[in-house]
């Protein structure tokens, strides 16, 4: 087990955030909260510029994320979006995905951010382990113009098991699978002596 790999280190940090209860200390639904989550997961890792808003333009495939020149105002507007019901929360999540405020690690940090918003406002979270990778990535890709599909997919995966560690750790594994990272399972990291 390569304990120096980005996947191992950041997954272990996420597990430690859960186990220590620090995951509940982040400012929920805010840009600051997302920056803090990103920093907690990825600080000291190459290529992340952890916890800092990107200053360069980025794209994935044919999709260009928000222009870095307008990222500040865009993030302020996203932060002000309402979070009163499921649809509003997912709309906010979709907009944050379009903004893609970081150079790397957006998806993993933002999925934790989303779950914290859902937990606070609805007493629910997403059981990510049952959200199919292909469907999720495809529906996120079209979500800026047609969010109903990602809403349907995520609504089917809602659970009230917000304090269930296994839902969190298996969801963490799935979150990394979406990013093509599946060398380490959370349960294997968890069993390591050097906690």
PLM segments and residue spans:
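FIC/Doc superfamily catalytic core
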Residues: 1-195
